[in-house]
Amino acid sequence: MEKDAPLAATGTPSLMAQAKEMMEGYTLRARKGLGQHFLISQGVLNKILLAADLKPTDTVIEVGPGLGVLTEELIKRAGQVIAVELDDKLVTALTEKFKAYPNFRIIHSDILKTSPAEILGQNIPYKLVANLPYYITSAVLRQFLEAEAKPELMVVMVQKEVAKNMVAQTGDMGLLTLSVRFYGNPSLVSVVPGGAFYPPPEVDSAIVKVAIPQAAIMQGVSEADFFKLARAGFGTRRKTLLNALAQGLGVSKQSVLALLNRAGIEPARRAETLSMEEWKMLCLVYTENPC
């Protein structure tokens, strides 16, 4: 993991100048309600592109393209780029800015109301590369990870604390960790300071890469049962698994004790201490014989 050196509020002059020119030309402003912080660091941009490992045959979905700094580089490298943007003024500006590129398309829509299948229009492999607005990060991650048409790779900019949860190891894992690791293999690319954006956010961000294999990581595990158990286990984090599962599942402690014994898990442990393999075993045992 790398951390960029702190940047001045102006960031990289060339990208900052481009941002100001575009904002003035189209009478744009960063809308706080939409969590808009525009990327102005060439170094951070390069790290995103390196992690995305784009090829001329790739299809890329970008959520919240902002002023198009990342979009422009995606267009140069990928075969097709589909951006999804809610801000109508940005849609107008980006449509004009990239009108000469036949491999670019922008959809004016709320990403949370638009499925990956609807965006793509066909069943093809794709990558998600995006600087995600903080306020919808978890919802967007769930939407793409749980979709029937999952990306083969996700490279996303998220709040630093969210990134830490996404890549957490056994002992520190939470529900978000399990949600990501159920489908893919996450890794932290780089921590990004607030000065890499305009206007700068109050917290640091981070780039996270999630590789999603074609073959399911949790082969043979019921998705519904897995997340039912996970939500119950993490519903009351300070409680032991015995108490948390009994309360979360609405069953007796005796039933949960029998379940944990069959899975070979100590009832006094807490949810965050379980490894992915232990969650898998717990789920398999539960599916075979529910409490």
Curated annotation (Swiss-Prot):
Keywords assigned: Cytoplasm, Methyltransferase, RNA-binding, rRNA processing, S-adenosyl-L-methionine, Transferase
Signal peptide per UniProt: none
Subcellular location: Cytoplasm
GO molecular function terms noted in the UniProt entry: 16S rRNA (adenine(1518)-N(6)/adenine(1519)-N(6))-dimethyltransferase activity; RNA binding
Ranges that cross the membrane: none
CDD domains from the UniProt entry: AdoMet_MTases
Pfam name, any one: RrnaAD
GO cellular component terms, semicolon-separated: cytosol
The EC number(s) this enzyme carries: 2.1.1.182
Keyword Methyltransferase: yes
Catalytic activity: adenosine(1518)/adenosine(1519) in 16S rRNA + 4 S-adenosyl-L-methionine = N(6)-dimethyladenosine(1518)/N(6)-dimethyladenosine(1519) in 16S rRNA + 4 S-adenosyl-L-homocysteine + 4 H(+)
Gene3D superfamilies in alphabetical order: Ribosomal RNA adenine dimethylase-like, domain 2, Vaccinia Virus protein VP39
Domain of life: Bacteria
InterPro entries, alphabetized: KsgA/Erm, rRNA_Ade_diMease-like_C, rRNA_Ade_Mease_Trfase_CS, rRNA_Ade_methylase_Trfase_N, rRNA_adenine_dimethylase, SAM-dependent_MTases_sf
Principal location class: cytoplasm
Positions annotated to bind S-adenosyl-L-methionine: 37, 39, 64, 85, 110, 131
SMART domains to which the protein is assigned, alphabetical: rADc (SM00650)
SUPFAM superfamilies to which the protein is assigned, alphabetical: S-adenosyl-L-methionine-dependent methyltransferases
NCBIfam families from the UniProt entry: ksgA (TIGR00755)
Xref: PANTHER family: DIMETHYLADENOSINE TRANSFERASE, DIMETHYLADENOSINE TRANSFERASE-RELATED
Protein family: Belongs to the class I-like SAM-binding methyltransferase superfamily. rRNA adenine N(6)-methyltransferase family. RsmA subfamily.
Stated role: Specifically dimethylates two adjacent adenosines (A1518 and A1519) in the loop of a conserved hairpin near the 3'-end of 16S rRNA in the 30S particle. May play a critical role in biogenesis of 30S subunits.
Protein name: Ribosomal RNA small subunit methyltransferase A
Gene: rsmA
